[in-house]
């Protein structure tokens, strides 16, 4: 399963949603993670807190991931998740953007 984290303003949300739709069109099992907007404390360090503006588009199809699906790829927020990331980093399936374009994302099967 591929999980696309949605965060930022409307422009970023639209780009992340476009990636999600592309992955779905390629037949991948993809879901969106909107916890950046729903979990308390996730936007504390942001100067301009944002809202999930994709939800204003009523007929926009989007499948959201569950907390369990997210934890399976990146671990939990608590002590066990931190230990997993430190002691067994090979079990964590998280990709971080470093450039504008990453063609390898289309070859991933399990990634957050």
Regions found by a protein language model. Name each.
Residues 1-112:
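N-terminal targeting/anchoring "stem" of glycan-biosynthesis enzymes
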């Amino acid at each position: 399963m591929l999980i696309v984290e949605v965060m930022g303003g409307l422009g970023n949300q639209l780009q992340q949603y476009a990636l999600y739709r592309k992955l779905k069109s390629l037949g991948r099992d993809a879901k969106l993670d909107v916890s950046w907007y729903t979990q308390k404390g996730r936007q504390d360090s942001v100067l301009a807190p944002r809202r999930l503006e994709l939800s204003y588009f009523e007929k926009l199809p989007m499948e959201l991931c569950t907390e369990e699906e997210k934890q399976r790829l990146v671990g939990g927020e608590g002590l066990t998740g931190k230990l997993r990331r430190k002691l067994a980093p090979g079990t964590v399936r998280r990709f971080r953007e470093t450039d504008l374009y990453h063609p390898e994302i289309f070859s991933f099967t399990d990634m957050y």
